[in-house]
Design a protein with these regions (language model features):
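Conserved, well-structured functional cores that handle cations and Mg-NTP chemistry
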Residues: 2-202, 206-225, 229-232, 239, ...
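Non-catalytic, well-ordered alpha-helical scaffold segments
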Residues: 35-38, 54, 132, 312, ...
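Extended, non-catalytic structural segments that build the interaction scaffolds
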Residues: 40, 308-335
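Short, solvent-exposed amphipathic alpha-helical segments in soluble enzyme
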Residues: 217-218, 331-332, 387
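Extended hydrophobic-aromatic, low-complexity segments
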Residues: 326, 337-343, 380-382
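Short acidic (Asp/Glu) and glycine-rich catalytic loops that position anionic groups and cofactors
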Residues: 64, 306-311, 318-323, 344-353
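A short, flexible helix-boundary coil/loop motif
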Residues: 1-32, 44, 155, 170-176, ...
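Feature representing long, continuous alpha-helical segments
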Residues: 335-342, 368, 372
Length: 401
C-alpha cells in the first residue's frame, strides 16, 4: 500500500481502540464499571481541551461527572496492573534491543494542600519552586516510537512523616519515603525483571550518580546520566590522566577535541551542539556481574551550546570502543520524554486530574499512559504504510467505538 488512506487510518484507530478496551476489561469486576472506564478513555482521546470530569461526562452522555470520578476514586481496581498492561501493549510494537529507557519527572501544578504529595518544590514545568505534585516517569524510546511504561508519584518527606496526612490521601501502608533516584532504580529494576529489551538508560542530573550507576553496571546496561558541574571525575589506566570537577576538566579540553553533532531531530530540525568525550577507564564487566564478559568504558561526555557556550555534563558507561556519536544519540533520546510530557498534557489531560488521593493520581496517569501508548502504536503502524513523501501522521481524530 503506497500510503495510509483516511479510511484505513480510521479503521486502524477503531481497531486499536477496541484492542485497548479489551485489555482494560479484566481489571474490573463488573461490566458497567468497565464501560465507565472505556468512556473515560474516550474522553481522554477526545477533542475537548480540558479533560475534567464534567467535560468527559458530557462527551460520554452521562448526566453528571460521578461515574467518571468513581473510576479514579471509589472503584476497586489495580492501577499497577494497568501499568503492566500499558507496558506490554506498547512493547508489542515498540520493542527493540537498541532502545533507550529514559527517566524524567514532570510537575502537576496545584492549589491547596490536600492533593497527595503536593508541596512547594521545584518543577521544570514552571521553571521555579511552586505548589505542585511531582511524578517520576520511565519512557521507552526506540526507532519505532516512544511511550511511557512506568510512573510513580513522588512523596516529599513532609508527607511521609505525617501519618494523618498519608491516611487522608489513602496512601498504602507499605509506602515510605523514597528519593527520586530510588524511585528510578525501582522502575529500572521492574523493567529489567520483565525482560524488556533496551541497551541504555538516559536521565538528567537529578538521577545521575551513585547507586544508580552501580545498579546499571551490574545489570549490563549502558548509561548516559547527567551530573552537576562540580561532580568529580578521574581516569586510570589511560595515557591521558584526568582528575577534577567536570567543569575544570572541560576548561582544559583542546579545541580540536570538540565535534559538532546532532542529538537527533527536533521540531526545528537537527538539534546541533558541540560535544567532547573523554574515556576515563576500561573495566571488565565481570567485576560487576560474573555472568558478563568483555571490557566496558567509563567516561565523561560534555555538551556545549553553540549559541551561548553553556555546558552540560554526563557520566557514561558503554561497551569498549563505543563511538561518541552513539552516546550523543542516547542523550538525545531524552527529548522524546519531554515531547511526551507536552503531548500528554496538551492533548490527553495528563495534568487534568481532579482527585486528591494516591490511587486517584496513579489511576488517572495510568489511563493517560494507555491513551498515549495507543497513539504511539497507531502512529507507527500508519506511518510504516505511508509514502516517504507524505507528512508524518499526527493523530487527533474524532473517534467512535
Amino acid at each position: 500500500m503506497a500510503g495510509a488512506s483516511i479510511e484505513a487510518t480510521l479503521e486502524l484507530w477503531a481497531s486499536s481502540l477496541r484492542n485497548v478496551k479489551a485489555r482494560l476489561r479484566p481489571l474490573f469486576r463488573q461490566e458497567r464499571v468497565a464501560a465507565s472506564a472505556w468512556k473515560f478513555l474516550d474522553g481522554l482521546l477526545g477533542n475537548e481541551p480540558r479533560k475534567t470530569g464534567w467535560m468527559r461526562a458530557e462527551a460520554a452522555g452521562d448526566p453528571g461527572p460521578w461515574r467518571q470520578q468513581a473510576i479514579l476514586g471509589r472503584g476497586w481496581w489495580d492501577a499497577e496492573a494497568l501499568r503492566d498492561i500499558v507496558g506490554d501493549y506498547a512493547l508489542e510494537t515498540l520493542a527493540d534491543e537498541e532502545a533507550v529507557l529514559v527517566i524524567d519527572e514532570t510537575g502537576f501544578l496545584k492549589q491547596g494542600k490536600a492533593s497527595c504529595g503536593v508541596a512547594r518544590q521545584y518543577t521544570g514545568s514552571a521553571g521555579k519552586i511552586t505548589n505542585c505534585q511531582i511524578g517520576v516517569f520511565a519512557s521507552y524510546v526506540s526507532r519505532h516510537g516512544h511511550a511511557f511504561i512506568d510512573r510513580a508519584l513522588y512523596l516529599p518527606q513532609a508527607w511521609t512523616d505525617d501519618p494523618e496526612r498519608m491516611t487522608a490521601a489513602h496512601v498504602p501502608d507499605d509506602v515510605s519515603f523514597a528519593t527520586k533516584p530510588q524511585i528510578a532504580r525501582r522502575m529500572i529494576a521492574r523493567t529489567i525483571a520483565a525482560k524488556v529489551p533496551f541497551s541504555f538508560v538516559a536521565a538528567d542530573s537529578v538521577y545521575g550518580t551513585g547507586e544508580l550507576e552501580t545498579a546499571l553496571r551490574k545489570a549490563g546496561k549502558g548509561y548516559v546520566l547527567g551530573v552537576a558541574a562540580n561532580h568529580v571525575f578521574h581516569s586510570w589506566g589511560k595515557k591521558q590522566m584526568v582528575r577534577g570537577s567536570a567543569a575544570t576538566i572541560a576548561r582544559n579540553i583542546p579545541k580540536s577535541a570538540w565535534r559538532r553533532l546532532s542529538a537527533g531531530d527536533g521540531t526545528k530540525g537537527a538539534r546541533l551542539h558541540d560535544w567532547a568525550y573523554l574515556e576515563l577507564a576500561d573495566l571488565d564487566a565481570g567485576e560487576y556481574n560474573s555472568t558478563l564478559t568483555g571490557k566496558w568504558t567509563r567516561g565523561l561526555l560534555i555538551r556545549r551550546n553553540i549559541a551561548d557556550g553553556d555546558l552540560a555534563f554526563f557520566s557514561t558507561w558503554c561497551p569498549q570502543n563505543t563511538p561518541m556519536k552513539k552516546l550523543v544519540s542516547v542523550e538525545g533520546h531524552r527529548w522524546a520524554i519531554e515531547d511526551s510530557f507536552e503531548t500528554a498534557k496538551n492533548e490527553l489531560g495528563l495534568d487534568h486530574n481532579e482527585t486528591r488521593s494516591w490511587h486517584g493520581w496513579h489511576r488517572h496517569v495510568s489511563l493517560v499512559m494507555l491513551a498515549f501508548a495507543m497513539m504511539a502504536v497507531i502512529r507507527h503502524r500508519a506511518n510504516i504504510t505511508s509514502s516517504p513523501k507524505k507528512t508524518t501522521l499526527r493523530l487527533r481524530i474524532t473517534h467512535r467505538s
